Structure formats: C-alpha cells, structure tokens
Amino acid sequence: MEVAMAMAVKVLLSLCCVGACGLAVYLYHILWLVPQKVLAKFEDQKIGGPRPSFPYGNLADMREAAAAAKAARASARRSGSGGGGIVHDYRPAVLPYYEKWRKEYGPIFTYSMGNVVFLHVSRPDVVRDINLCVSLDLGKSSYLKATHEPLFGGGILKSNGEAWLHQRKIIAPEFFLDKVKGMVDLMVDSAQPLLMSWEERVDRNGGITDIKIDDDIRAYSADVISRTCFGSSYIKGKEIFMKIRELQQAVSKPNVLAEMTGLRFFPSMRNKQAWELHKQVRKLILEIVKESGEDRNLLSAILHSASTSRVGIAEAENFIVDNCKSIYFAGHESTAVTAAWCLMLLGLHPEWQNRVREEVHEVCRGQPVDSRSLQKMKNLTMVIQETLRLYPAGAFVSRQALQELKLGGVHIPKGVNIYIPVSTMHLDPELWGPDVKEFNPERFSDVRPQLHSYLPFGAGARTCLGQGFAMAELKILISLIVSKFVLKLSPHYQHSPTLKLIVEPELGVDLTLTKVQSVCTKRGTAI
C-alpha cells in the first residue's frame, strides 16, 4: 500500500513538473518569442526601438521615465512657478519616454508592453496613408480593451469590423449639420445656470472673484449631451456623469496583467471598483431607457436598432448601454476639457480674448446666439482650433492591423498596434512653422491643415462623428462667457497637463473673473 502511495505521489509530482515546464514554455513563447518575431520583421525594414526585457517589454523604462517626470513637476510646483512658466508642450511631462525614443530612433520606432508590440508613427507620409486607409482590416487598437471594458464595452469607440460599421450608420446621422443646427437653442439654455452662477459669485465678492471652472463646465457639457442626445435633464443624468467620471479614474491606468493574459476578471481592488461602477451606470442608463418618451433623438435611434436586431435581450441591452456610455464619455468629457483649456489660453492672452469679445458683439448685435451667428465667428473658430492643436483631448490616434498591411511603404504584421502621437504631429515645426509652441490662432486664418498634420478629432474613416456638435457646443459656451466676463489667469493656477484617457488639467483651471457689458445673451436680452 505504501509503495503504491509513493508511486502515486511520484507520478503526481512528475505530472506537476511536466505541467509547470509546459506552462513555462508556453508563457515564454507567448510573452517573448512571438513579440520578438514581430520586432524582427520591423528590424528587417530598418525600423528599430528600445530593447525589451522579459516579460514586461519596455514597461520598466516607461515607468522610470514617468516617475522622473512626475518628480520634476512636483519640484517645479514646490518652487512656486505657478502659471508664469507655461510651456505649451506637455510631452516631456506626460509622455517623456516617447520623446526620448523618438529622438533616439526617429519618427518610426517599435516598443512593447508585455507581449503587445507597438509601432509609434510620426512620419507624415505614413500617417497620411494610415488616415486614408478605409479597409476594415485596419481597426481600433485592442490594447487596453480589457482595462477599459467596464467603461466602453463593445460600443462604437472600441468596436471593429462590421459591428463598428453598423453602429456608425446608426449614430452618424444624429450628428449631421442639420441636426446640430436644431440643437443650438438648447445649448444656449444649458449655459444659463453656469453664467448666472458665475455672475452671482462676482457680485457677491465685490465685482471680482477667482473660480476653478472645471466642474461647472462639466455640468454644462453633461447637460447638453443629456438633453440633446438622450432627452433627459442634467438633474436626472447627474448621477450617470458622476459615476462615469469615477469609472474613468478607475480605468485610467493600464491593467498590465489583463492586457498580457486577457484575465480581466481577476478580482483586484481596482477591478472590483470598476465592475461595481459599471453595474451602477448600466442600471441608471436602463432606467432612462424605460422613461424615454417619443422624442426622436440619438437614444431613440439606438433603441430602434436594438429592437429590430435579431439578438437576445441581454445582447440588446449591452448594445444600448455600451453605446450610451461611449457617447456620454466622448460627448461631454472631451468637450469640457477642451473648453477649460480654451478659457485658460484666453485668460493668458487678453489680446485674443478682446478680439473674440468684439467679434461676438459685432456678430450678435443684441440678438441671441444662433447657428448663423456661430458660422460668422471666425476669430473664435481659430482660437478653438489653436486650442485643439496645443491641447488635443486625445493623446493618440490608435489603430491595429487586424490583418497584415502595407502603409506608407511599411509592412505591418497582423496584430501590431499603431500609435500616432497627436501632439507630436501638432508640434512639428516643419508642418507648422518655427512658432509651433506658441499660441497663435492666426495660423488658421487662411490655411486648411493637411490631413496628417492636424488630428484633434482623429482622421480618416474613424474621424470623430460628433466634431460638428462639439465645435457648436464650444463656440456657444466660449462666446457667452467672454461676452459677460473678462478672464485672467488666476495666481493660483498651476499648469498640470496629465493623461487620464484624455489630456486634462490635473489641478484644474483657476481664473479670475470680472463682469463686462454684453449684448449676446439668452433670448437676445442685453445686459
């Protein structure tokens, strides 16, 4: 009996050893040999990059560079530099490793994160070819899909192929120009609580006050997207936006284990928080769906598509919830952050603030803002365009080769993630001139940027569907604010760009406000 037990133990141990060896070989193959083969294909094309290490690729180098940059920022804040030392180039602070590698390896280089290989592209001819590619074989990058699953799911921001094409056909018509024109009055109405609140604060503080503007602008943008696209007031949608904001924070850092192994269900503290927030957001969205009336809006279009699709109830609900979450996030967070950057720049450049204010006065002449007056605000348009050049919400245009492709003369193996650094394209002196890091809206006065040089809304087949909507929303808010207030950058402002899915001011935007006479207000009432 004892002999048999001993033999069984030996067999079991042998099997465990064989299994462990097999797992080790498999992991070595997946985490090292496979990405090395891909990197070798790029090396054959004279495309290099930093040397990866097993098993995390270049993650250690990236973290070290990011930590050093963070320490440098903290030191600068302690020294009291405040807003006086603003440089309109966030790359060394936010993405220091990419800048280092680009200088070492040129405008096209490779790197890896775990077993995921990336091609970092800032060479204009290759960027142009990527943007012009309409093949479904070039899709949205799947990297971070596991990390971002609770926020985006299978919605339009992350889907590929026929699924993405189907969603685009549903959502795109809701953001056509004629639809956006019909939303202008509603956008003006949504701005009134913000304007009245700021006016009351200025009056209460003797005609001048400091305001951290971020939350108020998010409230405005949230109200606009709720009412125009989903028919719900901000009061009803407020909880959704708060939860989505929390969810954004929860998934803003890569989950390396999930991305390398696909094990997104590992019950870490962050995963548990994200799952709980996802459940809460899902519940709130489905409640709004049940309460939705007969109004024709984006929500009704999504509901109609879900009801006519030959899928089960659970899949239909996922379709509704994932796309609502995607639109909530893209439709209010990016716009709110851009508005904050724009007001910061106007506070920093009073000459352009005056030009915009005078233009609004001349165009409106005591009448309410409407779609026609928005089209005539050329200076304001240039200011917003320049804001989007210096502070694009999206740090990258990300794509993935779903099949082997050749773009710009570069052979790209299947599965490779392609990252185009938007800020690098926007700050290329060969594309924009020697004053590339200066705020100069005049550069947009008579020149239409080339497809590969200006990417605030992406480009090509996956260009942001809501860019017309976002521009109208930004024009309305900025025009109403500058027509009522003089803006100055507060002494408390600290320049703090950071990347949390989008590039936002980590410490917010602090402005000093005083009132001015205005003729461009709600329903044409002069003040």
From Swiss-Prot:
Any single GO BP term: lipid metabolic process
GO MF term (any one): monooxygenase activity
Residues exposed to the Cytoplasmic side: 36-527
Record-listed heme binding positions: C464
Chief localisation class: membrane
Record field: transmembrane: 15-35
EC numbers, comma separated: 1.14.-.-
GO CC term (a single one): membrane
KW Transmembrane helix (keyword) present: yes
Enzyme class, broadest EC rank: oxidoreductase
Keyword field contains Ribosomal protein: no
Membrane topology designation: Single-pass type III membrane protein
Compartments where located: Membrane
Record topology, Lumenal segments: 1-14
Keywords of this entry: Heme, Iron, Membrane, Metal-binding, Monooxygenase, Oxidoreductase, Signal-anchor, Transmembrane, Transmembrane helix
Needed co-factor(s): heme
Function: May be involved in gibberellin metabolism.
UniProt record similarity statement: Belongs to the cytochrome P450 family.
Name of the molecule in the record: Cytochrome P450 714B3
Organism for this UniProt entry: Zea mays
Lineage, broadest ranks: Eukaryota, Viridiplantae, Streptophyta, Embryophyta, Tracheophyta
Gene name tied to this protein: CYP714B3
